Each structure stands twice: as C-alpha cells, then as structure tokens.
Design a protein with these regions (language model features):
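Helix-to-loop junction immediately C-terminal to a conserved catalytic motif
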Residues: 25
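Conserved ABC transporter NBD signature motif
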Residues: 33-41, 50
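Conserved ABC ATPase "signature" region
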Residues: 86-104
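Conserved ABC ATPase signature
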Residues: 108-112
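Catalytic Walker B motif of ABC-type/P-loop ATPase nucleotide-binding domains
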Residues: 133-136
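H-loop/switch region of ABC-family ATPase nucleotide-binding domains
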Residues: 168-169
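Conserved beta-strand-loop-alpha-helix hinge in the C-terminal portion
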Residues: 188-215
Length: 246
C-alpha cells in the first residue's frame, strides 16, 4: 500500500482480511514474513508504538469507546505522552474540528447517534496523527445519508494525506471510493487490481464469493466492451451528479 492511497480489502468471511489488519497493527504476530512501514520492519514495535503510525477503527464503535465524554475519549490516547495538557487540549480540539465534532466536544457520548460515535472512534485514532488508518466495515449499520457522510469524510481525510485501508463486504463502497482493491481467499492475496476490474471478472468474483455488480451485468447484456471502462465511467458520472447536481 502506498502513501495517500484509498484501498479496499475484500473477500469472503474467513478469507484473512481481519487477520491481516491484526498483523499490521501488532495484535497478532506473523509466523513468517515482515510488516514494513516506510521500509522499516515493525517487528520490534509494541502495539502502542505502532498506534502512533497505524490507526485501527473497529466495526462497532461501542467496542472501542471507554470514556463517558467525547473530549475525554479522544484525549485518552495522548495521556501518558510527553505532551503537556495544553498541547493535548489543542491537539484534541483540532482533531474534533476535522471530524466535525467540535460543537459536541463537551457532550456525553451517550447522546450521539451511531454514525457520530463512529466519528468519535475515528477521531480517537486521528488524534495520534497516524500515517495509515485501517477501518473494518466503516459504513456498517448506517443508512444511505450517513453512509455517504462517513465516506465523504474519509475521502476528505485521504485528500489531506492520510492513507485509508477499508475492510468491507460492500461492493458499491469499494467501487465508488477506492481505486484499488485487494482480494483475499483462504489467507492468500489472489488479486490486486482496480475495483472495476475486480467486479468485471466473473471467475474472480466466484472464487472470492463477491457480489457481481449490476453495472457489469448491464454492460454484458448491452454488448458494451470493455465493461470495466463502462463501470468506471458510470460511477464517475453518478458521483458528479450527486455532488454537483449536473
């Protein structure tokens, strides 16, 4: 994965997606091979040190949140660091502004919606200024409006220089938001291609138990070739219309 990329990791349940994330974050130790960040082997880094560079956001925000108040939750990762309390306050406030949570900084977390709690967990990771964020099913349990809000928020973070990796079963998310897709099956990486190329490959779809996009079906039935180009153009135009209204 390269800096400033936005990448999806897809595959059937048990394919190894979450295991890969745990290996990268240091929750599990690889039996062979290396985990490199900027060319440096992370084998000697403990979880806390890795968290300064790599953030992990779980699918259910309630499994990550441990404090009552928003400010306290986001500040938690910085406690015990070399930063002064004033530096921590400033870092937390800056992060809350980026995440659209600053107006709620003194609110109890219990007053937030599921989507807002999701942002709190992202803020608690971002406050450490990681180079890479890994998210497990970032839009799970959200309606379309909140789905769009969280994905546009993540796209904005990516445009600011944060590398974003998403573990997902949502093929539309993969297709619309991530130019690159990594496909896993039985613990092996079986494809590293564009999202459109993945979803226009029937054999790969079957092998990885992915869901064929209706756009690929439409392209085939209408005799449009190459289908990959049609899918990419359609997604681009659809995003432009929803974003700009024309």
């Amino acid at each position: 994965v390269y800096k400033r990329q936005m990448v999806s990791i897809v595959g059937r349940n048990g394919a190894g997606k979450s295991t890969l994330a745990k290996l990268i974050c240091g929750f599990e130790t690889p039996e062979q091979g290396q985990v490199l960040l900027n060319g440096r082997d992370l084998a000697q880094d403990n979880i806390r040190r890795r968290a300064q560079h790599i953030g992990y956001v779980m699918q259910n925000p309630n499994q990550m949140i441990s404090k009552t108040m928003i400010f306290e939750e986001v500040a938690l990762a910085l406690q015990g660091s070399d930063m002064t309390q004033e530096q921590i306050r400033q870092r937390v406030e800056d992060t809350l502004k980026v995440c659209g949570l600053y107006p709620f900084r003194n609110w109890p977390i219990s007053a937030l919606s599921f989507g807002q709690k999701k942002r709190v967990t992202i803020a608690s990771v971002l406050v450490q200024q990681p180079e890479l964020i890994i998210l497990d099913e970032p839009t799970a349990g959200q309606d379309f409006r909140h789905y769009t809000d969280i994905m546009e928020f993540l796209r904005g973070l990516n445009e600011q220089g944060v590398t974003v990796v998403m573990i997902t079963h949502d093929m539309h998310l993969m297709l619309e938001y991530t130019p690159r897709a990594l496909v896993f099956c039985d613990g092996q990486l079986i494809a590293d291609r564009s999202a459109a190329a993945v979803l226009c490959d029937p054999e790969l779809i079957e092998q990885a138990a992915l869901k064929e996009t209706s756009l690929f079906t439409l392209a085939n039935r209408c005799g449009i070739a190459p289908a990959e180009d049609f899918v990419e153009r359609f997604i681009h135009e659809d995003r432009e219309v929803r974003t700009h209204g024309c």
